[in-house]
């Protein structure tokens, strides 16, 4: 059996049983199993107040967040074993990032937050939720991704079903549980973790509190929360200030914003600004609440350029674009010219943002101001964009033509070889 080496099972990093958990400091093996395992370990450490065990799982989490986390919140870089590679192995065209692994990452980060009250875990949870996880299902709800590569040389599309059909059922189950991630309660502390419109009734001590949240987040940073206790009562409301609003895309140096300015954040109670008092990434509002109280959170959402740690060699010369918690992808289906995207040094400004209901219902499209080349390699779609002056030998053009003429190799080998020729592997 796993962990015991019985019934013919060999202890291995694949199953995370190559050494006792208390001695581990790197996340290895099958990504989904790792996320589920360490979710359970976090629970056990919390329930048993086992500091050594929690320190071990926190070391593993730090390794994941600082060396093995994709910008979209996905985990698991290797198709082989559906798992992790060495530190900083974050390739873009041949990565795996299974949908189930993103779900497991949400589970794990939620438990790490519950054990500590630290918002950094919710920052990773939110990034994964809005990018790596939700991409696993189509807007129509009937097609799914098993793996989620950051880029593809064409041909990678959502499927209606899989021989190993863990992801469709898992993502369906998860979507129904999202309301449970919005708030958390610890005695007289109420945490506002996610910004999602809706009504919730919470039990805070012996007081029933109704919270009505109104927002269009993540499309803008305006949030209103109506607080209605059934009686006047003193308790603390902790409103999370997301990492992206504090000039930090992830809680490590794995990714940083090129544009160094901090978005402006304001918190008002009944129209009056509150004195800034933070705890573990939360804006703390301690007061006696009464019916009719309203909390207003406003966060600027500039377009941000993101670069990876220099040790991620696959991302050298590359930038990503984000706005708020959303990582943007380039739509390239109508880009007929074989060319590269180029971003200049000056900040990028958003010109407008809209929903094209006739095309894809709830999907939002953004247009950008400023000098930039908007053409792309036909058939490619990648979340990262190339900076000017990098790989000017036309290798991307020749690689693509070579792929189109290849008829005997499998898709995965084509993708892998293309990445190697382009310098991404």
Label each region the model flagged.
Residues 1-11, 56-73, 127-138:
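Long, well-ordered core segments of solenoidal/helical folds
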Residues 2-52, 69-78, 82-102, 156-168:
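Solvent-exposed loop and edge beta-strand segments that line ligand/cofactor-binding
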Residues 51-55, 119-123:
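Short, solvent-exposed positions on alpha-helices
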Residues 36-51, 89, 93, 104-117, ...:
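Well-ordered alpha-helical scaffold segments within catalytic/enzyme domains
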Residues 57, 123-131, 136-229, 246-269, ...:
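C-terminal beta-rich recognition modules with glycine/proline-rich loops and embedded aromatic residues
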Residues 234, 292-294:
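Extracellular Ig-like/FN3 beta-sandwich strand-entry sites
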């Amino acid at each position: 059996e796993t962990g015991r080496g019985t019934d013919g099972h060999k202890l291995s990093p694949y199953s995370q049983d190559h050494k006792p958990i208390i001695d581990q400091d790197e996340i290895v093996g099958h990504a989904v199993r790792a996320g589920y395992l360490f979710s359970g370990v976090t629970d056990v450490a919390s329930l048993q107040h086992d500091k050594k065990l929690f320190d071990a799982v926190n070391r593993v989490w730090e390794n994941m967040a600082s060396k093995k986390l994709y910008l979209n919140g996905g985990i698991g870089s290797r198709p082989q074993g559906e798992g992790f590679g060495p530190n900083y192995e974050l390739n873009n065209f041949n990565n795996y990032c299974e949908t189930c692994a993103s779900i497991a990452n949400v589970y794990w980060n939620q438990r790490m937050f519950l054990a500590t009250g630290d918002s950094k875990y919710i920052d990773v949870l939110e990034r994964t939720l809005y990018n790596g996880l939700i991409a696993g299902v189509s807007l129509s709800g009937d097609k799914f991704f098993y793996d989620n590569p950051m880029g593809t040389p064409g041909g990678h599309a959502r499927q209606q079903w899989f021989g190993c059909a863990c992801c469709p059922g898992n993502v369906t189950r998860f979507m129904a549980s999202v309301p449970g991630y919005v708030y958390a309660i610890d005695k007289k502390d109420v945490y506002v973790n996610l910004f999602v419109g809706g009504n919730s009734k919470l039990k805070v001590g012996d007081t029933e509190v109704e919270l009505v949240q109104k927002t269009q987040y993540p499309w803008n940073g305006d949030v209103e929360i109506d607080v209605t206790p059934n009686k006047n009562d003193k308790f603390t409301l902790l409103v999370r200030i997301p990492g992206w609003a504090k000039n930090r895309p992830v809680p490590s140096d794995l990714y940083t914003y090129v544009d160094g300015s901090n978005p402006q954040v304001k918190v008002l109670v009944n129209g009056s600004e509150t004195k800034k008092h933070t705890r573990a990434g939360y804006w703390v509002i301690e007061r006696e609440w009464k019916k009719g109280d309203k909390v207003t959170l406003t966060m600027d959402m500039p377009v941000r350029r993101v670069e990876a740690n220099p040790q991620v060699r696959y991302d050298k010369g590359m930038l990503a674009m984000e706005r708020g918690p959303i990582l943007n992808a380039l739509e390239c289906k109508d880009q007929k010219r074989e060319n590269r995207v180029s971003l200049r040094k000056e900040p990028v400004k958003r010109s407008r943002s809209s929903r094209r209901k006739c095309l894809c219902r709830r999907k939002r499209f953004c247009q950008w101001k400023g000098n930039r080349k908007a053409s792309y390699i036909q058939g490619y779609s990648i979340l990262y964009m190339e900076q000017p002056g990098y790989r000017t030998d036309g290798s991307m053009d020749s690689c693509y033509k070579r792929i189109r003429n290849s008829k005997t190799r499998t898709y995965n080998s084509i993708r892998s070889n293309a990445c190697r020729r382009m310098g991404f592997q």
